[in-house]
Amino acid sequence: MNTQSKVYRTGEEIYDNLPCDSYFNMNAIRNLGIPTTFPTIGTFTLDSTTLGLQPQGQGPSPQQQQHQQQQQQQQQQHQQNMHHHQHQQQHMQQQQQQQQHQQQHQQQQHQQQQQHQQQQQQQQQHPTIGMFDANEVNDVIQNPPQIGVFQSNSVLTNGAGSGSSIFGSQSSNSSAAAADPSQTTRETGIIEKLLHSYGFIQCCERQARLFFHFSQFSGNIDHLKIGDPVEFEMTYDRRTGKPIASQVSKIAPEVVLSEERVTGTVTTELRTDSANNVLNSSETTGRISYENRGECFFLPYTKDDVEGNVNLRAGDKVSFQIATNQRGNLGACHIRLENPAQPVKYRGVVCSMKESFGFIERADVVKEIFFHFSEAEGNVELRPGDDVEFTIQTRSSASVPPQGREFACNITRLAPGSVIFEDVDSTVYKGQVLKSLDRNNPVRQNNDPLPGRIRYRALDYSEVEVPFGDKDQKGDFTLRHGDWVQFLLATDRRDQLQRATSIALLDETFKVSGEKREQGTIASLKEGFGFLRCVERQARLFFHFTEVLDTSREIDINDEVEFTVIQEPGLAYNNSRLQAIRIKHLPPNSVQFETLVASNIEGCVTREAPKSPIKSQDRVEGGVITYEHADVKKTIMYFLKDCEKPPRIGERVRFDIYMVKRNKECIAVNVQQVSLHQQQQQQQQQLHLNQSNAGANINQNDQLGGLSNGISSSSSNASLQNGYVMHGSPGGSTSSVGSNNPVHLDEFKMENNNHAGSDAGQVYRGFIAVMKENFGFIETLSHDEEVFFHFSNYMGNPNWLELGQEVEYTLARNGNTSVSGNCLPAENVRMLPKNSIPQPAVLETTHNGVVARPLRCINPDQQEYAGLIEILDELRTTVISQHEFGITSLVNKRDLLQKGDLVSFRIDESGRAACVNAVRQKKRATVDSIKGQFGFLNFEVEDGKKLFFHMSEVQGNTVALHPGDTVEFSVVTNQRNGKSSACNVLKINDRPDRLISRLKLNGDDTVPRLILIRAPKGPQGKGFSVLARHPRIPGNLVE
């Protein structure tokens, strides 16, 4: 009994000490029909358990063959008796189905023969090892790797040296795949999530997250936890076709650290060369001894395991953590010298701070350490990014969950730049991006702080890959796989890890990759983003400032850039929009929105261009010019902004043909009248003759329109009057706008002064018609169009300008028409004294009429600028007369006359309406509120909303207007958007002094009133007192 127990313990120890490199499937062994009864230990057999892993060179002994034949005969006889008994029962129950019974009997006999043949094959392939007794145990103990003549590891590793399967030919496909791991590729991963019957694995070698069912895990599922490393095979689900993980098994991590730190003594120090302080190659490891439960253990360590850049000597007291590698070997790591008299000083940088604690990134190891604010020496206030010096203590308390937690103590601040983590090489390398950063999934970047990869050729012409992070680029622009970049190498002093930094994108990328690049200009800028005007796109394109490649250059409007267009990532395709990335600045005049096709083409105007372009189906309609090209008659569109002077129908013009890149349409640019150009040459010749004529009474300044009122006359057929070309003027006569003879104004045909073919210094006059936030429009003397002007071109303070004010200006021949529409902008705008421009005399008769057409500032869609008033008969069915009006015709220049408004007016000598005054119904209401430059009246319009009014519509002193005041006003409805507002707001009386207080009080004096004699106080915010926290005995009142 003692011998057997000794053998049993010895065999158990042998089995525990044998290394296990794989596992076998128990279901496959059960299918082999292994008997469950075995002989006693003294004469036990291993014939069924080992399945014949004996080498083929040794055959079974005669005793083993005889014993094997007896067992087979007993099994066959037992099976035949069982089948014969079943056959008799079926024959008695199924006498009517004799034929079916015979077929079944034949099938059963066939199965018996097959089973008999399989058993014989198994016996031939897997002969028994032999029989052992207790006397042979000593030999087994002396040679533990071999039992008999085969390796003990072979039982678990499928025979090690033999090619036969451990499960025989009858094993299933799944067990055969498990036995031969070379058939499929095994991957490693980390358990990310576990649910009630399934989980998810995060792959280590690639960015993938695979589903797995608990039935695919080989082991106790209760032992599997989140974060455990596992090994698996990737397959595809038959129903959904998605990749899943199968045959999941738990593996040991590469290095397992003990939670607690252990103290010990250095017994063998690292040998270094004292002269050069270089590690001796003969002694690369040292040894540390420590005690555990009365036993002494020795652990190896290397120089990389020592913290603080200190040299350990024999006998030094140290603390360390025990690490277990993948092979199960133990070692010491994170070794720290423990010297209470002179503690080791460590350095680092404060990386994060909370309410009363923070973390320091250590400069000696890649690790962060905890610290409390109270550990800072003196009154030093630490901030993130400060360089500090500290000591390390290990504290153990019940309040700290991890026992033996490390704390930073005695923290002192160092000078900025004292702590250096890495050394940056000055050599500029050129490489190619293998793996770009996935900025749309920051969760995956947290797992790897350096997820990017760049491949470059080293100095020894070897291919090297280096990682990089999200802060290593010169900017946050988008990097793609295959981009060519230049960078610097930064080497971490702590672990000698190299990474790429100062990464800049090379222009070679766009040339090699064939990436489609587009051009445009910056149209507008916001906070952190902006919009581009594209050459080949109609809509503006969104972009982030971070996508600009040149971070040293400021972004300004009208900068010419080159970019790539993509769909905005992170959104569905229906909701996503286009955006520009990888934006590169271009030299000035590099971007051309139009391409010159032909120049100096002559044609004839067949349709005049409208003064305001008409949009129809996303297309702007302009004028039409007909010309001949290669004996083919063609038409081309033109706009007023591209003309020096608006041509009329039938006039001959010369122009250049440009093709717009965004819509591939051709337009006429630089349109000039051929006849006008010749006329200018004739006028210049005539002026030259007049100057040489000694008897001429008109000097050169008079011919250029230098009179005070802007009117000039000459003996030529065409005279200039206020910048207008007057045709048909009587020779030698002088005309004036303010003349009492109205016949002169009817005889002349006034041309548009905005594009007159005169010199750039020609001075024009007009009236302020519209004023916006930083620009406005000037109504010309002919009252038929407006001229755009920016406040920056006004010579004076634009706040002093008023509607209807008389001004003079010059025109910019080639000005910026993108902001002024089709009309050229005005420059050098100056205010004139009142009544500087004479006006026609106004008749005294007052008429009533209806506005048939408002001014173009009220309705920008109409082509005519001037408004129109109709005088109707008593039945309001027949139009008696029509009269145009402008900004100078209005009594109240801020009055917005709309179509259908009733007005009273007079008529001047030219037939235009003057002294126009709107006839509106006056209403009264009280002021509800005033908010800066606008307010609201207690007058309900538009579904109960209060009526809006602007402070500019208030007549009189606007400061005296307060909420509650009674005002008189008129209601105006904007026909474009349907919104109503109040105009001509006039204050009637003030609000009563105690109106609000009287409204709150009840007017009935007979009922009781609630009077407030003391206002309530809020809580102090200091919490309860200390006495309120003391326990008290129920029933006893404490005073």
UniProtKB/Swiss-Prot annotation:
Domain named CSD: residues: 186-250, 261-337, 345-413, 428-503, 517-585, 593-673, 763-831, 846-919, 922-987
Record InterPro entries: CSD, CSD_CS, CSDE1, CSP_DNA-bd, NA-bd_OB-fold
GO terms of molecular function: lncRNA binding; mRNA 3'-UTR binding; mRNA regulatory element binding translation repressor activity; protein-RNA adaptor activity; RISC complex binding; RNA binding
Renumbered residue ranges of the record's region Disordered: 49-126, 165-184, 721-741
Effect annotated for changing N977A: Decreased affinity to RNA
Subcellular location: Cytoplasm
Effect recorded for Q216A: Does not affect association with the 3'-UTR of msl-2 transcripts
SUPFAM superfamilies: Nucleic acid-binding proteins (SSF50249)
Biased composition (Polar residues): 49-62
UniProt keyword terms in alphabetical order: Cytoplasm, Differentiation, Repeat, RNA-binding, Sexual differentiation
Quaternary state and interactors: Interacts with Sxl; cooperates with Sxl to prevent translation of msl-2 transcripts. Interacts with mle; promoting association between mle and roX2 non-coding RNA. Interacts (via CSD domain 7-9) with pAbp; promoting translation inhibition of msl-2 transcripts.
Protein name as it appears in the record: RNA-binding protein Unr
Organism: Drosophila melanogaster (Fruit fly)
